[in-house]
Each structure stands twice: as structure tokens, then as C-alpha cells.
């Protein structure tokens, strides 16, 4: 298995958090969520930050959290869905470790995101606006080292695919 961090990216509801926790357990690594880093540093929930200060303030906090992650090694990191899509951040993520895009079907990831609640990026947006956001982010996510299609798969299946992709990537580099 490759040394260094494994960084999970993808749209909200793609399974980054739940798959990241299981992946970290399977690899014997720590699990870190960028949103948790933001909450710990700021003292407010993500919805509170959005509501009180707006998205631009949240994106600044996200950039600070990303800088803090530069100190991490051999962890599994789950990013917020928008983190890779701003100000060269995908380049930073690629420097942190192997970036894995969890690519799911829009309807599927959106249904999961809505079920989980606390998604400020969904608030007040039409289905068309959310679809545009999803498709607008794909070009950023596509810069990942590895893409894992998650459509119709359960958590164990997704993690198995991530592990297989990481092994394959590591074998190709040795």
C-alpha cells in the first residue's frame, strides 16, 4: 500500500466520510475530515458558519484547515465537496497524498446528502442549480490520481474498490 495520505474527494453525499472511516480502519490509519478540523478551530458548526458568515468566510476557514493538513502523514482525509474546487487546492491535495475521487450518480449522491441533513450548499437551491454545481465540480475532481465509481455500491464494496485501486497504483509505481 502506498505511503502517505489517502485523500477522498467528491460531491456531497458521495460517501467520503463513511467510506473514509472504514478505509482508515482497514489501513490502520487515522481518519480526518476537513469539516471537523474547521469546526474544532472555529467552534461553530458548518451550517452556523454558512448562516452567520456566508460561503466566502467558510472557504477561507477551509483554506486554513487545508494548510493544517500539510502536517498529516499516512492518514485518510475526507474533504468537503467544494474544497478541491477553489484556488489551486487540488494541487495541494495531490501533494498531500493519493487523491481518490468517489464518483457517484447525481441522483444517488443527492438523495444521500439530503437524508444526512446539515448541507448548507443545498439550502435554497433548485435541482437545476445543484446539477450545475455537481457538473461544474467534475473537472476538479477528475484531477484525482484515482477514480472509483460508487454507483449502486455499498460501503464495503466502495472501500474494496478503493483498496484495489490503491494497490494497483502502488504496484504500477514500484
Model-derived regions: residue spans:
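NTP-dependent small-molecule kinase module
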Residues: 1-2, 22, 26, 72, ...
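Hydrophobic anchor at the beta1->P-loop junction of P-loop NTPases
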Residues: 8
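P-loop (Walker A) phosphate-binding loop of NTP-binding proteins
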Residues: 11-14
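Walker A/P-loop
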Residues: 17
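ATP-dependent small-molecule kinase phosphotransfer cores
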Residues: 30-94, 118, 127, 138-140
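Short glycine-rich anion-binding loops that position phosphate/pyrophosphate groups of nucleotides
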Residues: 81-83, 105-107, 153-154
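A glycine- and Lys/Arg-enriched "phosphate-lid" helix/loop adjacent to the NTP-binding pocket
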Residues: 95-139
Amino acid at each position: 500500500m502506498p505511503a502517505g495520505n489517502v485523500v477522498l474527494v467528491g460531491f456531497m453525499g458521495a460517501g467520503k466520510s463513511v467510506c473514509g472511516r472504514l478505509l482508515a480502519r482497514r489501513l490502520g490509519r487515522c481518519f480526518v475530515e476537513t469539516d471537523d478540523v474547521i469546526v474544532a478551530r472555529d467552534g461553530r458548526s458548518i451550517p452556523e458558519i454558512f448562516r452567520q458568515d456566508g460561503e466566502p468566510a467558510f472557504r477561507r476557514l477551509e483554506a486554513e484547515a487545508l494548510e493544517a493538513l500539510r502536517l498529516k502523514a499516512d492518514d485518510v482525509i475526507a474533504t468537503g465537496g467544494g474544497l478541491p474546487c477553489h484556488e489551486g487546492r487540488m494541487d495541494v491535495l495531490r501533494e498531500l497524498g493519493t487523491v481518490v475521487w468517489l464518483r457517484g450518480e447525481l441522483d444517488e449522491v443527492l438523495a444521500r446528502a439530503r437524508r444526512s441533513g446539515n448541507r448548507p450548499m443545498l439550502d435554497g437551491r433548485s435541482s437545476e442549480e445543484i446539477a450545475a454545481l455537481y457538473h461544474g465540480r467534475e473537472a476538479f475532481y477528475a484531477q484525482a490520481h484515482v477514480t472509483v465509481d460508487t454507483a449502486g455500491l455499498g460501503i464495503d464494496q466502495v472501500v474494496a474498490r478503493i483498496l484495489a485501486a490503491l494497490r494497483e497504483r502502488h504496484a504500477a509505481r514500484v
